[in-house]
Amino acid sequence: MSTAKDPGNGVYEILSLIFDFPSNEQRLWWHSTAPMFAAMLDNAGYNIHDQYRHLGIFKKHIIPFLGVYPTKDKERWLSILTRCGLPLELSLNCTDSVVRYTYEPINEVTGTEKDPFNTLAIMASVQKLAQIQAGIDLEWFSYFKDELTLDESESATLQSNELVKEQIKTQNKLALDLKESQFALKVYFYPHLKSIATGKSTHDLIFDSVFKLSQKHDSIQPAFQVLCDYVSRRNHSAESDQHIALHARLLSCDLIDPAKSRVKIYLLEKTVSLSVMEDLWTLGGQRVDASTMDGLDMLRELWSLLKVPTGHLEYPKGYLELGEIPNEQLPSMANYTLHHNNPMPEPQVYFTVFGMNDAEISNALTIFFQRHGFDDMAKKYRVFLQDSYPYHDFESLNYLHAYISFSYRRNKPYLSVYLHTFETGRWPVVADSPISFDAYRRCDLSTK
């Protein structure tokens, strides 16, 4: 009998006894992901009532939009959210103890003739969430969706002419930041398919859409102009000194009152090095205030601790097979937040640690937490991760961490981890199962 600790401290187990599921697919999604979700809420210090609320929302309003449960022998919609196409990812702001999850809404018509490129499911999902959370505003959602995703005519044209050859077809996803008993909703847009339909680059679609928005909301114009100038200089210099140009990959915004919402532009950085990350952080030397430089010192410290390999990298064009152990390194990324009435865009940089040893990453983060006074997280983080995958050989894993993001504001670091969220806790896997990462576990969930 295994003595592995149960993630969730009882909340997951109790809800599993209570919940009924309308399909086996939803039951599998719950038992695969809820153990880690429950453990993360508990370790981040959410009170017991909020843990039940957020897990209840997850079961009722999110799991129905995750599609078929992934197995190697079953066709499914592949999401850009993870390297093996899973449509869900948990993340944790370790320095602020905020739990978050991101998902690509999927429904029964996703990938069919009615919705070949998954344009529609997000609308139904947003409407469900707007019914249970006050303050959700869809003005900027509607604007960017029109600007950056396919309309019905474009979708039909791409489908009928077989113009989409790529395996990656995600256009949008949602994220919930869990704040005590409430959540803040964000949306992300990937305009790659819109680029195919219109002939405009993904980069131009994103920057043009923000430019038009800034004409109406001029309070974001100063920060946007600074970002435009920086990207233009970087891309111009790419011709002379062989640096790789920056290109916008995706965009996000908060689904709240536009007067308070933030726009984030995500730039793909194909050169992975400390000097390039320093350039991204300071906007080529434009941000040199005391707070920026304090953050830069911590960024350098993280770089030294994590030991990310350097190089010039391309983002893969396809997905890893489910259960495939990665043997790859991803390019880097940074996002820039455009705040109202702030003349300078705020950077957040990403350490792409996918494919690196998870035990070593956990140890590096623990040292960082210890050095900067996050003692509780230093004690809990590695234990939480091991307990979420109790039957794996933790020392040999290299796919639990996808990214580590870092920003610095109000004189403190904001560090988040983005984690593989699949078959967590006591997930039942047998030797001839077509799923999982070859971990053998024994737990009968057939009655739950």
Curated annotation (Swiss-Prot):
Substrate binds at R100, K186, Y188, R262, K264, Y266, Q348, Y350, Y414, Y418. The keyword NADP does not apply. The keyword Transferase applies. It comes from the Eukaryota. Keywords: Alkaloid metabolism, Transferase. CDD domains: PT-DMATS_CymD. One of its GO terms (molecular function) is tryptophan dimethylallyltransferase activity. Pathway: Alkaloid biosynthesis; ergot alkaloid biosynthesis. It catalyses: L-tryptophan + dimethylallyl diphosphate = 4-(3-methylbut-2-enyl)-L-tryptophan + diphosphate. One of its GO terms (biological process) is ergot alkaloid biosynthetic process. Its EC number is 2.5.1.34. L-tryptophan binds at I80, L81, E89, Y190, R249. Homodimer. Belongs to the tryptophan dimethylallyltransferase family. Tryptophan dimethylallyltransferase; part of the gene cluster that mediates the biosynthesis of fungal ergot alkaloid. DmaW catalyzes the first step of ergot alkaloid biosynthesis by condensing dimethylallyl diphosphate (DMAP) and tryptophan to form 4-dimethylallyl-L-tryptophan. The second step is catalyzed by the methyltransferase easF that methylates 4-dimethylallyl-L-tryptophan in the presence of S-adenosyl-L-methionine, resulting in the formation of 4-dimethylallyl-L-abrine. This is Tryptophan dimethylallyltransferase 1. It comes from Claviceps purpurea (strain 20.1). The gene is dmaW.
